[in-house]
Structure formats: structure tokens, C-alpha cells
Design a protein with these regions (language model features):
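Short, low-complexity disordered leader/linker segments with a strong preference
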Residues: 1-36, 323-324
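Soluble non-cytosolic domains of exported or imported proteins
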Residues: 44, 72-76, 91, 143, ...
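Secondary-structure end/capping motifs
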Residues: 231-305
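Pocket-lining segment of extracytoplasmic ligand-binding domains
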Residues: 95-96, 170, 175-260
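Short helix-loop capping/hinge motifs at secondary-structure junctions, enriched
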Residues: 125-133, 161-164, 228-237
């Protein structure tokens, strides 16, 4: 009887071991078969929803894809990687993406990255009523000429009744702007967070205007995906956008958004807390009306001929995704 019991126990161990090995092999095989999605970004609050998406994905037992976030330090390098197909998508300036589409790049915008979160900074102690047509030109830093930040400054110039040409612009990476302001190389800058809050924290800058006060809820950054991913792996793209949509509503929880940014960005928690107060997420649908506002401004400022909404935006993935 004792011998029989030992044989039974050994048999159970053998069967269990085989099952464990089979399960382990199946998991390994599933991991190998997962589609890897490479998404480019700059370390700004506008891209933080990607980090929340990656965190959400890590909580799944059987994720449908792998998300690889690829960090860039400037917009030209990011767009070169996107347009050449070295990455599958990006969180990028909407105007840059529109220009790439107009030039023939195989990309589509599927969702916004954020709402608000843009500032116009000036030297500490500066006031808007100091701007006039009598003095020297005013030199501002912008991340790129094809950006909502350029449009915000040009619209502010018009609101202040400053003649064209009195605002000059210098393209620089967002991270360079607070130092350039401190060194008086520029009189101000327009940029994404957290570099507005950082400028104030360093004691050299002052927020002259929030973007919303110049152009209410102007679209700024969008999530774009390459056509190859959308055409050849539609189910994977849908799963990614599903998680991205869920994460956008999670980002409206201020503590969660600050936690995720503190984990991924270099700035202090105080700076990122201020940035989070100026940036919102939630519903990230690219609406025709919001897109039309940007295309109108792009045309008014003679930047380029923008693509039509239907040519540039693929709204169905975000629309069909559940928020919970």
C-alpha cells in the first residue's frame, strides 16, 4: 500500500511538471509571437499618457502586444524616425505630423495626446503691457515653426497689436528653453510642460499667458501611427488604442498622473505637480471642429497647405475603444 502511494505521488509530480513545462513553453511562445509597437516621444507631459498605457499593459496576464517607448531629445530626430519607418508611431506636434502627411508620409493621427498644458513664458518681472512697436524685436524660443506654440505666440502678437516681424523665433529643444531664458538669449518662450513650470521654479521666468487664454483648447500634440501597423496589424493597433483611451481617463487622476511623470521624467515632484495642474487628458478624440481650427491657423500664417481631416485622421480606433 505504501509502495502504491509513493508511485501515485511520483506520477502526480511528473504530470504536474509536464503541465508546468507546457504552460511555460506556451507563455514563451505567446511572448515571441507578440507584435512589438515602437512609439517615439519627447519627455514632456504631453506624452505622459504613453507611460500610463505602458503601466496598464504591464498589469495584464496575457497582453496582445508589447509596447516599446523610444525617447528622443528633439522633434526633427523623432519625425525622421517616424517618416522612415524606424518606429511605428509617435506622440508628436500635430502641425509636424500634418506637414509630413502633406509630403506623403504614410501616417494617420488616431488620438490627441492631451488638452491644454502650453504656456507662454517671459523674463521674470515682465508684463504684457511692456510689449510695443517702438523698441527692438522680441526674441522667443519655440520647439519648431510647425507647432501650436508658434501659432500661440503669433496670435498673442496680434492680440497685443504688435506689427508682423517684431516677434522673432528661435527653434530649440524644450529642455534648452529655461536655460536660454535665464541667460537672456531669448526674452521668452512657448513650450509644452513641464518646461513652463520649470522656468518658474528656477526663479528666472514668469508665465505671461496660458495657451488656453490665447487659443482655447488648441490641439497641440497627437498620437500618430504608421499605415503599415494600421493596415497589417489592425487588431493590435486597436488593442493599443483601447489601452491608450483607458489610460487617458486614468491620467485625469492628478495623483496618478504625477506619480507616473515622477517615475519617468527628471524634474522634481513639485515641478511636475504644477505641470499636472496645467495639463488635462480624459477624452482625447480628434474632433473635426478642433482640427479645422488648427488648419485655419496654419493657412492664415502661411505655413503649408494642411491635409483634409479624412486624409489625416483615423478616428474609428479611438471611437470604438471602451474607456473602462
Amino acid at each position: 500500500m505504501k509502495r502504491l502511494s509513493i508511485i501515485v505521488i511520483i506520477g502526480i509530480f511528473i504530470i504536474t511538471g509536464c503541465d508546468w513545462q507546457r504552460t511555460s513553453k506556451e507563455r514563451s511562445k505567446n511572448a515571441q509571437n507578440q507584435q512589438v509597437i515602437k512609439i517615439g516621444y519627447l519627455p514632456i507631459t504631453h506624452s505622459a499618457n504613453l507611460m500610463m498605457t505602458k503601466k496598464l499593459l504591464s498589469q495584464y496576464n496575457h497582453p496582445k502586444y508589447k509596447l516599446e517607448l523610444v525617447k528622443f531629445n528633439n522633434w526633427p530626430d523623432l519625425m525622421d524616425a517616424l517618416n522612415s519607418g524606424r518606429i511605428d508611431g509617435a506622440s508628436t506636434l500635430i502641425e509636424l505630423a500634418m506637414k509630413s502627411k502633406q509630403k506623403g508620409s504614410n501616417i494617420k493621427a488616431v488620438a490627441l495626446d492631451h488638452h491644454e498644458g502650453n504656456v507662454i513664458m517671459g523674463q521674470k518681472g515682465m508684463h504684457l503691457n511692456e510689449f510695443n512697436n517702438n523698441g527692438d524685436d522680441y526674441h522667443f524660443g519655440i520647439p519648431h515653426r510647425y507647432s501650436t506654440h508658434y501659432l500661440l505666440l503669433e496670435e498673442l502678437r496680434k492680440q497685443l497689436k504688435i506689427k508682423p516681424g517684431h516677434f522673432s523665433y528661435h527653434e530649440m529643444s524644450p529642455a534648452e528653453m529655461p536655460a536660454a531664458l535665464s541667460e537672456h538669449r531669448i526674452i521668452g518662450y512657448s513650450v509644452a510642460e513641464p518646461f513652463g513650470a520649470l522656468g518658474e521654479k528656477l526663479g528666472k521666468g514668469k508665465t505671461l499667458k496660458h495657451g488656453d487664454d490665447v487659443i482655447p483648447d488648441a490641439y497641440c500634440c497627437v498620437l500618430v501611427l504608421r499605415g503599415e501597423l494600421l493596415d497589417q496589424h489592425k487588431d493590435v493597433a486597436q488593442a493599443f488604442v483601447q489601452d491608450y483611451k483607458k489610460s487617458g481617463f486614468k491620467m485625469n487622476d492628478r495623483k496618478q498622473s504625477v506619480d507616473i511623470m515622477t517615475h519617468h521624467f527628471k524634474q522634481s515632484r513639485d515641478v511636475l505637480t504644477q505641470s499636472a495642474a496645467w495639463t488635462s487628458y480624459g477624452d482625447l478624440t480628434i474632433k473635426p471642429s478642433g482640427y479645422q481650427e488648427i488648419t485655419t491657423l496654419v493657412k492664415q500664417h502661411h505655413l503649408f497647405n494642411p491635409p483634409a481631416y479624412d486624409d489625416f485622421v483615423e478616428p474609428s480606433l479611438y471611437k470604438e475603444a471602451s474607456r473602462s
